[in-house]
A protein has these predicted regions:
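N-terminal hydrophobic targeting signals that begin at the initiator methionine
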Residues: 1-2
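Charge-biased low-complexity segments
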Residues: 5-6, 17-139
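Short, linear, compositionally biased motifs with a strong N-terminal bias
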Residues: 10-11
């Protein structure tokens, strides 16, 4: 049986600027977007809970495609930039990788994320941009 090892480098990278359309970067927003599972988590644990939930979703997705025999890749890394909208949905903005197959998998993962509790700034839901580096390793 294949052993799956996925390392999620969730160093949620932040840009340090604002746009004119209430789009903020993760580091700059007052209330961070959250998974439903992180709703009751203390503010000091929000980022850790976010990382754990994202890691869990990515692991489950990779396990599902490797169990179907549809993944013939050994390893890969994708840097994906995406936004979480005020309605909690996600939209991929840009991806960088040397392997288009991993980009396609990453796109499906981000598009299949469950709705988020949206980020808020001054009490209003806002768009939040994030950069997520994902490193896949299959053994």
């Amino acid at each position: 049986m294949e052993k799956l090892s996925l390392i999620l480098l969730l160093a949620i990278t932040y840009y340090n600027s604002y746009s004119q359309t209430d789009t903020l970067f993760y580091a700059n927003v007052e209330e961070k977007p959250r998974f439903i599972e992180c709703k009751e988590v203390a503010k000091t644990q929000e980022i850790q809970c976010f990382k754990e939930q994202m890691d869990k979703i990515i692991r489950e997705y990779i396990k599902s495609i490797t169990s179907q025999g549809t993944c013939g890749f050994i390893q890969g890394r994708v840097n994906v930039s995406f936004c979480i909208n005020p309605d909690g949905t996600t939209k991929v903005l840009q991806m960088k990788s040397t392997d288009k197959d991993w980009e396609a998998i990453t796109l499906r993962i981000i598009e299949s994320l469950p709705p988020f509790i949206p980020a808020k700034q001054n009490g209003k839901p806002v768009v939040v941009k994030m950069l997520l580096p994902i490193r896949f390793e299959l053994e």
